[in-house]
Amino acid sequence: VPTILTTVIEERGGYLIKGLQDVFPDQKPVNRTFINTWEDSNVTDIVKKSGRKQLVLAALYTEICLAMPAIQALGEGYEVFVVTDASGGVTAEAHDMAVRRMVQAGAVPITWMAVLGEWQSDWARTETANGIASVVLEHGGASGAALAWELQLLATTPPETTGGH
């Protein structure tokens, strides 16, 4: 899945969250000055070049860095999914109001676990199943605990976690 990472004025401390950068160690984030990512042609050119019309977005500051590009991309005909539990606002209310605003504009709210499940789709897809299971075991909360229990009952070795998820 093509992924675009962005930062805001990196030289002033706008670095990407380390855990996220660890997942994409070879990718240099687009260092932008625009508050609305969608106004930065360095970002939109990458999106247009990909040919994709569905966007899955997450951001720190839901009410600004997520809502602004999501709403603008919707206006340009993109189908936008906003990963609500991988995003956050300055307050719970700010996050909730921003999600409502995006939904009113046509965005589809989704959780990271739902994205993961939709992309995996079938556990028979063995090329990705172990990686997905590792992520669920490490970050899946009750679902991860249930998977660990299932693996234990079946006397199955859990996939090795590579970290950085």
What are the roles of these predicted feature ranges?
Residues 3-8:
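Short beta-strand segments at enzyme active-site cores
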Residues 10-165:
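Active-site-adjacent betaalpha module
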